[in-house]
Curated annotation (Swiss-Prot):
Catalyzes the formation of phosphoribosylamine from phosphoribosylpyrophosphate (PRPP) and glutamine. In the C-terminal section; belongs to the purine/pyrimidine phosphoribosyltransferase family. This is Amidophosphoribosyltransferase. HAMAP family: PurF. GO terms for biological process: 'de novo' IMP biosynthetic process; purine nucleobase biosynthetic process. The active site is at 22 (nucleophile). SUPFAM superfamilies: N-terminal nucleophile aminohydrolases (Ntn hydrolases), PRTase-like. The keyword RNA-binding does not apply. Residues 22-241 form the Glutamine amidotransferase type-2 domain. Disulfide bonds: none annotated. Pathway: Purine metabolism; IMP biosynthesis via de novo pathway; N(1)-(5-phospho-D-ribosyl)glycinamide from 5-phospho-alpha-D-ribose 1-diphosphate: step 1/2. It holds the Pfam family Pribosyltran. The keyword Transferase applies.
């Protein structure tokens, strides 16, 4: 296999936002498979900016390109795409939540099996990945990366089933957590989604060839047709037959569970033009802002979004409240990201590199700042300072999601619980004082549910994954202090 390398550069990073782990894209049977995969990954760049990789197969051998950095930094080069021939391809954009930032962790990961090679790309996180890794190492396995995705390759290799498809299914039956996953062999493209449906995965079609990707925006960029969402717990096996036709076999190997898609796909992660779970993301975010205005009104002169995530919600807030909307903060979209762990001091400095106050829209006014979420509060603090320096008379923060109390273990890069702003202060008033705002309010959990799904949260059977707000984890967390960790956190939430 070919493998290309490049090296990371250090760029400023805002460490007060949540980050999704990955985006995946795969296509089977198309002569321009790698080029289409690169375009799909470009549309999914928001899901991971640390690294991107593509694997292809041309009927004889597998080819691989893996690079640190953005998709456009490498895969717009015709020479790079020329090194990825073939009609089968999968690709991956990465933001690490498990495993260090290193070339050996850049996906897709590849392994040679007795019946041929297999490559895997994975979005999400396995909550028993570390436990399984320790088990396979104890029995003689040698791991080449620190990514939890590699565990799947080992389980596939150890499976006693005859076909690669059955080996793959045998492996994912042992995995717990939230994931969407693509695998490719010499003739197959396999898609899988976790039994709870925490991470999204969609199926599309271009020129009669099947496509799987994290979001519909990756279908739109190449003019592909959306077919349907991959169902929770579903495995879809697409295979090129000897006559050139493509067979599609959909299976449900896991015990059916109620789907609980991650709410943060709507709050922050998914691109606004994507359709996730049958819902336009932009519309749900605008609904969040409208509900926020109903729940937490304030006398003000202007509604200003914290770009870019807060923009749809700010539009909704302005529409519902009747307060004019203005771009009072301008974002620099050309500030890069870092591949080192930044200090809090560097994090705070990075805010001004990304955001500038538009004084003409702010000076002398009472400002409502609308953001999608608050994690540590460091960004909010600096933005409030910036808005006051630009002459705002009052600054009121409205957040289009509930307070975050609990860490995530399903593919979102969240701090430890004690680093979250909501756990550092006794009440919202104390948080507002820390940030320097005249007032602070968060959208209620029911307000969020109504914005996305049209009805209140069902506490007996929540319609979405919302553990970061409620402590109600949808699966056990075997790697985190044993099987009872999820129940303990849920009890903490109910007692809080």
């Amino acid at each position: 296999m070919n493998q290309s390398h490049s090296f990371p550069t250090d760029d400023p990073l805002d460490g007060d936002t949540l980050h999704e782990e990955c985006g995946v894209f795969g296509i089977l049977g198309h002569p321009d498979a790698a080029a289409l995969t690169a375009l799909g990954l470009h549309a999914l760049q928001h899901r991971g900016q640390e690294a991107a990789g593509i694997v292809s197969f041309d009927g004889k051998r597998f080819y691989q390109e893996r690079h640190m950095g953005l998709v456009g930094d490498h895969y717009t080069n015709p020479m790079t795409l020329a090194r990825l021939p073939g009609s089968i391809s999968i690709g991956h954009t990465r933001y690490s939540t498990t495993g260090e930032v290193a070339m050996r962790n850049v996906q897709p990961l590849f392994a040679e099996l007795e019946e041929g090679g297999i490559a895997i790309a994975h979005n999400g996180n396995f909550t028993n990945g570390l436990t399984l890794r320790r088990q396979i190492i104890a029995t003689g396995a040698i791991c080449q990366s620190t990514s939890d995705t590699e565990v799947v390759l080992h389980l596939i290799a150890r499976s006693r089933h005859a076909s690669t498809s059955d080996r793959f299914i045998d492996a994912i039956r042992q995995m717990e957590g939230g994931y969407s996953m693509l695998a490719m062999t010499r003739t197959k493209l396999i898609a899988a989604r976790d039994p709870t449906g925490i991470r999204p995965l969609v199926m599309g079609e271009l020129d009669g060839k099947p496509i799987f990707c994290s979001e519909t925006c990756a279908l739109d960029i190449i003019g592909a047709k959306f077919i349907r969402d991959v169902e929770n717990g579903e495995v879809i096996i697409c295979e090129i037959q000897p006559d050139g036709s493509i067979s599609i076999d959909a299976r449900k190997p896991s015990k059916p569970q109620p789907e609980r898609l991650c709410l943060f796909e709507y709050v922050y992660f998914a691109r606004p033009d994507s359709v996730v779970g049958g819902r336009n993301v932009y519309t749900t975010r605008k609904n969040m802002g409208m509900n926020l205005a109903k729940e937490s009104p304030v006398d003000a002169d202007v509604v200003v979004p914290v770009p870019d995530g807060g923009t749809p919600a700010a539009l909704g807030y302005a529409q519902e409240s009747g307060i004019p909307f203005e771009y009072g903060i301008i974002r620099n979209h050309y500030v890069g990201r870092t591949f080192i762990e930044p200090t809090q001091q560097i994090r705070a400095f990075g805010v001004k590199l990304k955001h500038s106050a538009n004084r003409a829209m702010i000076e002398g006014k009472r400002v409502v700042l609308v953001d999608d979420s608050i994690v540590r509060g460091t960004t909010s603090l600096k933005i409030v300072q910036m808005i006051r320096e630009a002459g705002a008379r009052e600054v009121h923060i409205r957040v289009a999601s509930p307070m975050i109390f609990f860490p995530d273990f399903y593919g979102i890069d969240t701090p430890d619980a004690d680093k979250l702003l909501a756990n550092q202060y006794a009440d919202v008033e104390a948080m507002a004082k820390y940030i320097g705002a005249d007032s602070l309010a968060f959208l209620s959990i029911n307000g969020l549910y109504r914005a996305v799904g049209g009805e209140d949260r069902n506490p007996a059977r929540p319609q979405f994954t919302d553990h970061y707000f409620t402590g109600d984890y949808p699966t056990r967390l075997l790697d985190k202090n044993g099987e009872s960790m999820g129940n303990k956190l849920s009890m903490l939430a109910s007692n809080g």
